[in-house]
Structure formats: C-alpha cells, structure tokens
Design a protein with these regions (language model features):
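Conserved GNAT acetyl-CoA-binding A-motif
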Residues: 131, 138-158
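C-terminal "cap" of GNAT-fold acetyltransferases
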Residues: 160-172, 176-190
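Conserved acetyl-CoA-binding loop-helix of GNAT-fold acetyltransferases
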Residues: 112-117, 123-140, 170
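Active-site rim helix/loop that mediates acceptor-substrate recognition in acyltransferases
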Residues: 37-73
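Conserved acyl-donor/pantetheine-binding loop and adjacent beta-alpha core of acyl/acetyltransferases
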Residues: 53, 65, 69-72, 78, ...
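Conserved beta-strand edge residues that scaffold enzyme active sites
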Residues: 81, 152-153, 182
Length: 190
C-alpha cells in the first residue's frame, strides 16, 4: 500500500458515488451472498423490518437516502479515486438493530459494525487506516467509547466482517465482555 495515495473520506452526499462504486463492484467478489447488504443491516429495526426480505435494490436505495440525510455513517478508503475499503461506524443510537441490546451510557458509545476491504487489497493495512478514521470520527462527534463485536474464531474474510479481533487488540481495544454466540465485545476509550 502506498501511504501517499491512500486516503479516507467520510460517507457524505459527495462521497456516496465512491461507496456505491465499491458496493456495486467487486467488493463482494469472494462473498456474493452478502452483496445485497449495502451496510444497511444495523440501521434496521429487526422487530419492524424482516431483514431476509430486504433486496439489494431496496438496501441500495436506503443507503442513498440515509447517506444524503446524514443518517448513515462510515468511512471509505480510496487509492486515488478507486474505492478499496469500507468501515461502517456510527453513534449507537443510529443503529436500530442494536436497540434490543441496551448498554449503559449508550449515547456515548460509537459502534464499529462493518469492515470490507477489496479482496485483492487485503493484508495491506487498509483496515487499520479505516479503524483509525472511524475512531477519530466517533471522537469528533462526542463519543467517548468505540465498541465492536468481532469473532475470535473467524476462519474466513467473511467471518471477519466486523473486523479481525487481532486488529482491535493491536489498536488499543480491550475485551469488554463475551457474548453467548462466542463473539466478544471490545471497547476503546476515545
């Protein structure tokens, strides 16, 4: 990775075309069954919306609407003008899929819920750069805690869609608690 040509931009109306190019393109070439998500899963209240019935077209439209209304947040890694990575990170109160998992001081918690790096660019440190940008962005919004839910036993890139546990631990996150499904919650003070 050339550090001089890699940049990270926050999702916005202006950067939305980069997000769409990445998600419409080869981002999921090694995991096509998830290509319909457009990082909308955590924005939905699953008591209201049946996620399994949400189509790619619907999710793409919702991503556009939410990005334009500043109700969806995340960071896009660009190599020049080519999108090569994505990190979904937002204040917890925007992520309605987490509504049934209350946490103390939720208004101060930013959740990192998605990592996606172009398959041909994995292992180059792009996720680390995205994680730093996500933490900086959450801090700038007044969040005092960054939280994520990685899978310790991840065997594939798809299993690491919340980000690799090793990435978080090497970036100053610590295990906050274990979940019944074998995953862990990690946190970092911002």
């Amino acid at each position: 990775m050339s550090s001089t040509s890699l940049s990270v931009t926050k999702l916005s109306t202006e950067s939305l075309p980069h997000f769409l190019k990445f998600f419409d393109g080869g981002a999921f070439s090694d995991n096509p069954k998830w290509s319909s998500c457009y990082c909308q899963c955590f924005y939905e209240n699953h008591d209201v919306v049946k996620w399994s019935e949400c189509t790619a077209e619907r999710n793409r439209s919702m991503a556009c609407n939410r990005a334009q209304a500043e109700e969806m947040q995340g960071y896009i890694a660009l190599e020049g003008q080519e999108p090569v990575g994505w990190c979904g990170a937002a204040p917890r109160h925007l992520l309605h899929a987490l509504d049934d998992e209350p946490t103390p001081n939720a208004e101060a918690v930013g959740a990192i819920v998605c990592f996606l790096v172009a398959p041909h660019r994995r292992g180059e440190g792009i996720a680390r750069v995205l994680l730093e940008a996500a933490c900086d962005g959450l801090r700038a919004q007044g969040m005092t805690i960054a939280e994520a839910n990685p899978r310790p036993d991840a065997k594939t890139a798809a299993d690491n869609h919340f980000g690799p546990l090793s990435l978080y631990l090497s970036s100053g996150f610590t295990v906050h608690r274990e979940d019944a499904d074998g995953s862990v919650y990690v946190r970092h003070s911002l």
